[in-house]
Amino acid sequence: AQGIQTYRCNPDNTANNFCTLSGIQTNSPSTVISSGALRVDSSANSGVAYGTVGIPTTGKWYFETHIDERSAYNHLGIQAEALPEYTGVYRVLLREDGNVYGNSGQLGTAGWSVVPNDVVGVGVDSDAGKVYFWKNGGSQTSAWDIYNFGFANPRGSESYRAYFLGGDGTGATFNFGQDCTFRGQKTGTFNKDANGIGEFLYSVPTGYKALCASNFPEPQVKDPSLHFQNILYQGTAETAKEVSGLKFKPDFAIVFNRQITHPRSVYDVIRGGNQQQNINEPDATVTRAPFGLAFTDDGFSVSTGGNSNNGNAYVAHCWKAGGPAVPNNDGSVLSMVSVNQDAGFSIIRAYAQTSGSITLGHGLNKPPVFWFYTPYTGGTNWYIYHKSLGAEAWLQPDNSTAATTGNNAAWAVSPTDTILTHGSGFVNQKDIIFYAWTEIPGYSSFGEYEGNGNSWGPVIITGFKPALVIIKSVDFVDDWTVYDNVRNDKNLADNIYYLNTEGDENLDDSSHGIDFLSNGFKCRGTSNQENKDGGRIIYMAWAESPFKYAQAK
């Protein structure tokens, strides 16, 4: 009997995921990913394939590409996807004729061309911001600069990925360390990377590593559920309800009634459990007796005196901050903060100015990239800062309006490692509160993407499998759409609600659906809220599991 051919057995497994080609991020049905997601074939011009994982912004990284079929349009190397606010595409690509192209056009030439059966090695020195190419294990090319490597890509913290562009009738097989025979097309020599991992046809350059989970740095937050969780519960309407099952004592919660028209209630540790405010309304804080929601060691208790125990089904999104607030004097006025630096979350309370602007210390030790803001007294809408919009723009989570831009009245200047600014447009607001996050790779991601209006929508790389995703169109009047992993335990994730309204849950609404991936999410719906053709859309996402340890749904 004949055994299974060795090239059909890859070392990729849940303990050490290798990069592959993304079968859900090709640019058209004419681009086909096959052979264990390592081969790409294009039957039309400009067939595109991306690697599934981002190239880390530190270290040295290596992969190989076998040219199966060639055309005048073959390009391979690394590329970051086009983004709404940038002109052009960030890339370093080798064309089949040996010319090397970057963001601004041709960079130079490799001094050789490639033909079918050639193998091109690609080395990315992230520390130096350089790319190298090797042909059939020969001498390396010149060092090609990566344009603006490590730039703040709104799609995630990892900007560049392996990339192939092919014309009609072209094909290539990649090896990220899984198969040095390229699906039986070469006799394997099984060279290892710098850590003794993988199998490559040619010797791996000194210090270079395979794009696989074992080689990636440990995430700052290995277990996101120690800092953030969604939880479902059923209200009782008659008695206080104990909700347990969290791995931490929460300090901030957004509670949504899934079955009836109802506000989206917010509770936090600084104001206390008897103080409720609704994120979808410009109303003042409401005092609930005996309490609305009281945080416990592994959850919370909701009373009959609040809006979060009306006998219906609920979901609560819960974050851990730092417990009772402590003084912070980093700003121009005193702030009281409850901060969790490990997970990048801070609750900030202060007293507003009567003129001009003030600065507030936030305690994160990194610039916050997203926050909710509201005064206690009501009468003023909630406001949102998002890094993709900048300091002269804002959105409001209590309505569906497009972003206000070109106005510095709210924030005035961008936040720093220590402070954020409360602008001159917010005078005489008395007690104010911020819920602010900074980005923690592998745990939280705040960015933007461009919709395409069809069910083969964009893939957004966050670096983790999401537990919670909130999406909002920047340019158009559209609702804030919320997805989570407890109301959507499988793909398609199409049980949604809107943060800015009082409506109940939309079930099985495929026009708004997304897929949760091991490293991000993909838009499957065609609605304007999440995927308007050409629309600029921001997102906020928190993790169920970092990519290094994730398994997709």
Positions of predicted regions on the chain:
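Surface-exposed molecular-recognition determinants
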Residues: 1-60, 66-71, 82-553
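Active-site region of the double-stranded beta-helix
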Residues: 74-80
